[in-house]
């Protein structure tokens, strides 16, 4: 399998000129190269992008061109079937940084453990940066863009973490690798805002388009946008998706600046790079849910001993990047780590990948999924509740408000009504990914699929048992986290959250 042949948008400027500018900028910002390419251990660098699906041109997206991410794919290995184990930031990042399923470490509820009921990792589990520190690595978490002055060496400048368990900031030496000892290898996380760059208002979207045009030579043409069939071709929905694709362009530009810096510091060829996102696009059926829109992510690896120009279609999970990075640095993978080295010579491909969605902010849910080569099976523990049950975060978005308005006016198609606004959900969902890539038709109740359903039930139950995933969140944990959450909210939004908390508490008492 080979990557698709791509053509450049007409408005794109010469990338050779822009690349030269980036390289020159990196030289000014980063200073002279250190000449560390001969060091014994490779550097490890993770690009971690927020709220973004695989809408990059190397993955077939035709409305944008992403030359820097495409370069990583061309010079490395691109995975076409990589999935996050959690479709929301904090559980995903908690899993990523430990190489363990979030349900294994008790970190599955979004922004949990912040209050009077802190979450502690099991005694044997150690965050990945600590493992690298113990091996002599300099660890950092920031933007990947060299800064002037000493501020980039301070821990208070760290990039996003969002871990749901107790951890010590000393796991990171700084926000940038420029403070390390000459020749010392580094482990760096480069945080990119990704889909969070798109705003809610027309003026914000216009500003993003202007920025995309200035930084990449092109802004997205709305007429080129292709929506999934369960979203209406409505102006608000199209404008939002257009802004999202401009965020994809700017994400790519950020990657380009970091690559330019690595080249100027003569570090690129000895750096093991992973590009990924924490979960899919923030949309009605994306972020927070276990369909492809929420769990399918881009995953590209470039570096020493990584096959160049390779495209792999085997199933991988985002927790595999932890084990793969340790292996690349010749650090022993701990026996407790559930992620796998996807380049291991004796590696066995995964037969299935798993995911879990639990409480998101004030909104309680419990959904589990297992995916094989052909099938996606989803189990809903609260099927009597609608998919889009009240949630202040989602309901505050203009796209959700517009979808609810179209629903109220009867303007959605029957398919869109069924997918987005069914009053209840099925206890079990089964989708044939070969014939139904958008997961539109639940075939779990079809008698001819009875054996498949039984097999998927067994797979899912075995995985849950292996993680000790057998209980919902306790009322005390919920109360503790909601107390902290409300402290950060004001005005009308706080009132909405308080009402949602009351509703969720009532539903729990009723066994709903």
Model-derived features: positions:
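Short, solvent-exposed turn/loop segments enriched in Gly/Ser/Thr/Pro and often Arg
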Residues: 58-65, 78-100, 108, 141-160, ...
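Long, internal low-complexity/basic segments
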Residues: 33-42, 48-49, 54, 78, ...
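Polar, surface-exposed loop/tail segments
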Residues: 96, 144, 149-166, 268-271, ...
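N-terminal secretory signal peptides that target proteins for export/translocation
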Residues: 1-13
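Active-site-proximal cap/lid insertion segments
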Residues: 54-63, 110, 167, 178-322, ...
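Loop/turn elements at helix/coil->beta-strand transitions in domains of secreted/extracellular proteins
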Residues: 40-45, 75-80, 135-139, 183-187, ...
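Active-site segment of extracytoplasmic enzymes that catalyze sulfate/phosphate-ester chemistry
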Residues: 31, 46, 53-126, 131, ...
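Bacterial N-terminal signal peptides
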Residues: 15-27
């Amino acid at each position: 399998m080979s990557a698709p042949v791509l053509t450049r948008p007409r408005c794109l400027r010469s990338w050779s000129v822009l690349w030269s500018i980036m390289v020159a900028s990196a030289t000014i910002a980063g200073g002279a190269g250190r000449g560390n390419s001969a060091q014994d251990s490779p550097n490890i660098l993770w690009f971690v992008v927020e709220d973004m699906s695989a809408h990059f041109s190397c993955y077939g997206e035709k409305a944008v061109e992403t030359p820097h991410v495409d370069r990583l794919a061309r010079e490395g290995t691109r995975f076409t079937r990589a999935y996050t184990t959690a479709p929301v930031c904090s559980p995903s990042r908690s899993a990523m940084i430990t190489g363990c399923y979030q349900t294994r470490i008790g970190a599955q509820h979004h922004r949990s453990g912040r209050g009077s009921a802190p979450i502690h990792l099991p005694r044997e589990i150690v965050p990945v940066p600590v493992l690298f520190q113990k091996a002599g690595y300099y660890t950092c978490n920031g933007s990947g863009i060299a800064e002037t002055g000493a501020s980039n060496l301070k821990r208070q400048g760290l990039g996003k973490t969002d871990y749901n368990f107790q951890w010590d900031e000393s796991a990171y030496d700084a926000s940038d690798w420029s403070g390390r000892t000459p020749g010392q290898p580094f482990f760096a996380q480069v945080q990119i805002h990704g889909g969070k760059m798109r705003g809610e208002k027309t003026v914000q979207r216009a500003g993003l388009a202007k920025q995309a045009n200035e930084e990449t030579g092109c802004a997205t043409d709305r007429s080129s946008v292709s929506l999934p069939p369960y979203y209406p071709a409505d102006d608000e929905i199209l404008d939002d998706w257009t802004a999202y694709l401009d965020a994809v362009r700017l994400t790519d530009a950020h990657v380009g600046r970091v690559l330019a810096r690595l080249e100027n510091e003569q570090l690129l060829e000895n750096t093991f790079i992973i590009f990924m996102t924490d979960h899919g696009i923030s949309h009605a059926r994306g972020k927070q849910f276990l369909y492809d829109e929420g769990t399918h992510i881009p995953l590209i690896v470039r570096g020493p001993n990584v096959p160049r120009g390779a495209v792999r279609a085997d199933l991988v999970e985002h927790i595999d990047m932890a084990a793969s990075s340790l292996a690349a640095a010749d650090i022993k993978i701990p026996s407790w780590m559930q992620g796998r080295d996807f380049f291991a010579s004796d590696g066995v491909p995964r037969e299935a990948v798993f995911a879990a969605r639990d409480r998101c902010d004030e909104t309680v849910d419990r959904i589990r999924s297992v995916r094989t080569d052909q099938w996606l099976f989803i189990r809903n523990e609260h099927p009597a509740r609608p998919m889009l049950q009240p949630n202040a975060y989602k309901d505050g978005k203009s796209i959700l408000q517009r979808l609810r308005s179209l629903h109220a006016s009867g303007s959605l198609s029957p398919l869109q009504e069924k997918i987005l606004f069914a009053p209840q959900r099925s206890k079990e969902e089964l989708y044939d990914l070969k014939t139904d890539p958008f997961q539109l038709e639940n075939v779990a109740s079809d008698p001819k699929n009875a054996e498949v359903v039984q097999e998927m039930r067994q797979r899912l139950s075995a995985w849950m048992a292996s993680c000790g995933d057998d209980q919902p969140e306790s009322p005390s944990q919920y109360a503790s986290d909601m107390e902290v959450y409300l402290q950060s909210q004001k005005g009308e939004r706080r009132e909405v959250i308080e009402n949602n908390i009351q509703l969720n508490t009532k539903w729990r008492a009723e066994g709903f």
